[in-house]
Amino acid sequence: MIDTAKAVADLAWLVEIGADEAINDQPTDWTQVASRRAPTAREAGPARSPASAPPAAAPGRSATPPEKKSPALATAPALGGADAPPGSPLGMTEARASARGAAMAATTLEDLHKALLAFDGCPLKQTASSTVFADGNPKARVMLIGEAPGEQEDRQGKPFVGPAGALLDKMLAAIGLDRHAEEPDKAVYISNILPWRPPGNRNPTDSEIAACLPFIQRHVEIADPDILVFLGGISAKTLLAKTEGITRLRGRWFDYGSPGLTRPLPALALLHPAYLLRNPGAKRETWRDLLSLREKLRGLPPRP
């Protein structure tokens, strides 16, 4: 018999690490699927009367599906809608505009941190314990960008300090990098797409990512690293404006551009350390990706 509780837990874990594609046991004949058409009004039969309509959603459950999470927000227009999200005094359009203005006004990391602390356009701030800004050496040549704080990060106010962070530190040490190193060539600087923990460690919604996106974009511009590393699917897909899952993006080099940068930055996508904790068999390919990062770093010209 199927262990339902285990199946649900496994599915929740897959969603948490960014899995976004389902593969069937048998190949799908898309030519047959495409040939199917929706029934016409005549074929579908008469419209339902109110008495035969589906029952309303039970109390405490939404009658509409949850907001779909999609990538490619880096180039998406501002989200519309004047209604404010729960816990936010701003509507989506106003929140995005407010974030963009506050982020662009910052010229130093300290300014950006203060602007983030003063920003109230994302409802996640209302439920989080801490604003998780960054950790490591801001002068490092390598900047790592994760997805969102977890429980330990929310408590301590720093990114990657839980079990996944411990593994990340070991991964970095294996190629001679350390978040606490003073020498920029041996240090890393770490931040996240979102500075606030989503309740229950759920994936952030499109609107939550969009509200915070201008801050991480400006963060990259001010820190001005030589290499970017995206940890996990949400980070990679959002900042690279890609639709592929992380298993297809990992190990590949991309050019990351932004108006505030003087040149495109080489960017590498890696599997999230949380994924590696649950799927140790993927460490082999991640090791190859880390070696690629080391070679790219060694090939950089000296900083002036």
Language-model segments: residues:
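Non-catalytic accessory regions outside enzyme or core folds
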Residues: M1-N24
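A polyanion-binding, active-site-adjacent surface
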Residues: D20-E21, D25, D29-W30, R37-P304
